């Protein structure tokens, strides 16, 4: 299972990017671990991990739909077994803001060269992390919108295709803004993006595009409340992140172009 991803170019380039950005943070390690680390697992270690992390006091139950709270609680009390109250604390190694290396190149027999450009940003938590995530998402959407000079210029010159996209990858003590896709000349794409980011940091983002993107994101978020599964996911993700379920709606409605420009300059 660990080795089967070694010939997946998307998987390889993703972790190559993380390993180029992070010195110590475990996010750079393949989620399945390594062959060496798996070999060290014993039955005792496995049971210890199970009883420590798969613990009711370390879990959140999220229920959405046509149900009654009292009935759900009664059923949970009947089926769930009492366990030791264990308070867990995740301790991450100190991570410098400097990157490990500016470029990683891996050769593989694929039809088109793939690239990921990752910006290592300052991590945050709670509401601050939510605000940063929303601002970063909007800023990248404005910069790379299909009508933006950056996107149109790269598309016209054949530097990108329909696979070009952006992503915010963040979690406990890490935050990365990513731009990715396929290109015959990834270095030219990198220089175009660098120039566009520098110009936006100096002169500001397109305000009309920002407002349109913000309103579009707001509308999409509101529509999710019609989906029962999406509501359940929202509640559990909010609980795990230390925020309230409606904080995203409130935060998104209050963001301004000045907030986005400030994030772009500082991050």
Q: Model regions: which residues?
A:
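Charge-rich, well-structured scaffold segments of protease-associated domains
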Residues: 1-89, 112, 121, 126, ...
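Self-splicing inteins and homing endonuclease
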Residues: 97-98
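Long, positively charged, glycine-interspersed low-complexity recognition regions
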Residues: 115-117
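A short catalytic or substrate-binding loop motif that flags glycine-/basic-rich loops and adjacent residues
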Residues: 108-109
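Flexible, small-/acidic-enriched active-site or ligand-binding loops
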Residues: 101-104
């Amino acid at each position: 299972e660990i080795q089967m991803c070694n010939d997946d170019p998307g998987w390889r380039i993703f972790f190559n990017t993380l390993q180029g950005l992070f010195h110590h943070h475990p996010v750079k390690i393949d989620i399945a671990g390594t062959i060496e680390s798996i070999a060290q697992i014993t039955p005792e270690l496995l049971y210890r991990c199970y009883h420590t992390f798969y613990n009711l006091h370390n879990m959140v139950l999220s229920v959405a739909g046509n149900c009654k709270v009292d009935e759900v609680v009664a059923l949970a009390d009947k089926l769930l077994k009492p366990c030791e109250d264990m308070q867990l604390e995740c301790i991450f190694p100190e991570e410098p803001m400097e990157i490990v290396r500016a470029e990683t190149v891996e050769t593989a027999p694929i039809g088109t060269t793939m690239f990921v450009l990752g910006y290592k940003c300052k991590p945050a938590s709670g509401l601050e992390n939510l605000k940063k995530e929303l601002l970063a998402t909007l800023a990248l959407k404005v910069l790379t919108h299909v009508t933006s000079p950056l996107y149109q210029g790269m598309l016209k010159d054949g530097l990108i295709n329909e696979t070009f996209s952006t992503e915010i990858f963040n979690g406990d003590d890490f935050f990365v803004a990513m731009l990715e896709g396929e290109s015959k000349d990834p270095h030219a794409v990198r220089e175009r993006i660098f120039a566009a980011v520098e110009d936006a940091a100096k002169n500001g983002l397109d305000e009309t595009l920002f407002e349109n993107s913000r309103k579009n994101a707001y509308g999409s978020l509101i529509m999710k409340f019609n989906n029962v599964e999406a509501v359940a996911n929202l509640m559990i993700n909010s609980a795990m992140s230390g925020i309230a379920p409606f904080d995203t709606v409130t935060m998104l409605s209050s963001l301004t172009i000045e907030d986005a420009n400030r994030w772009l300059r500082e991050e």
